[in-house]
Amino acid sequence: MLWRALLCLLFLGCFAPLSSFAQDKKPKVALVLSGGGAKGLAHIPLLQTLDSLGIVPDLVVGNSMGTMVGGLYAMGYSGDSIAKIARSADWDNIMGGGTGLNDVTVEEKSEFNRYMVNLGLKDGKFRLGNSLINDQNLRTFISSLTFPVHKVHDFDDLPIPFRAMATDIVNGKEVILESGTLAFAMRASISIPGIFTAVPYQETLLVDGGVLNNFPVDVAKAMGADIIIGSDVGGNMLPKEKLENLSSIMFQAGMLNSYLKNPESRALCDILVDHVPNLTYSTSDFVKSETMMQEGKIGVSQNNDALVALSEQLKRFDQRPHKIPDYADKVTFDTIVFNGISKGNSTLVRERANLKPDTPYTLDEVKSGIARAMGTGRFSQVNYALQNT
């Protein structure tokens, strides 16, 4: 089964009973997942429990890792499927690099990864990168997982309507992403300042939503949620004795607004799954995914009675279907457009990517072409998007 498209490459607590609602109208149930880096994997047991109880939220709102986990859930992945992804993912590779040796050009192989610092050349000047981590592998990982819904551009059209939080770092504003590609929303929401590059968006730059609103319960409330299930892994402000190094001080400063807002956000939840006291690893410990998920079960079990009660009271209402939409396993491009690339590099990239119009490709074949383009060593990142024509 084939479909045709345009490929663009861009180089750059307590529970409120339902008896308080009208009995003939299903209450709007929202699921809100906070950011927290690797600790966000602790959200997954809640999703598995919702599945087992037959509770399908009417809205999912997430920030940072909560956007990744919540976005997958909103597009139709089950809690068990997301847990399987978390266990099998090569997190060191996803979070730690951009190009494999096999994709590097012959001319570059002798120099590959020989140096601790790479300098880029832009506008005739040498420049250091603006992040600690090359996010090419992360982008590829996200794009692969969200491929089944690449044709969905209004997040209300996902199996579960979805919103992602980000921060406009230029103007100091919250940004609620409600359209575009799900892969872009995930990547923007997880842009931890200094760790990952900021993401260009319209006339500004986006970074992690946690800078201003790590636990965006108020977004769900403003969208008319009657019942809010909140899952918080974000943590609290560190005491003076824990602010013992530059990184801890910088992280606390960057999250200060979210920390101050967190009590208000928690108070808006009807069911609050508080993971913070139960998590023993840090935001960067992705390799501890199994432990994170096991620890996530503790907070869920503490709210089991409230979740079961919600399930019982929702049984008289129809639940929305929750599965990944059907999608074609191959794509045929009508046109391939290269943006953000000089004419001098265009021929090289076209030859290396070796992707052509009117030829069917699997997702893996598209990814391989992108990796080969990245392997020229000319670019810090290569992004791609599929557009309907």
Q: What kind of feature is each model-predicted range?
A:
Residues 1-27:
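Bacterial Sec-dependent N-terminal signal peptides
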Residues 21-63, 71-388:
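Patatin-like phospholipase
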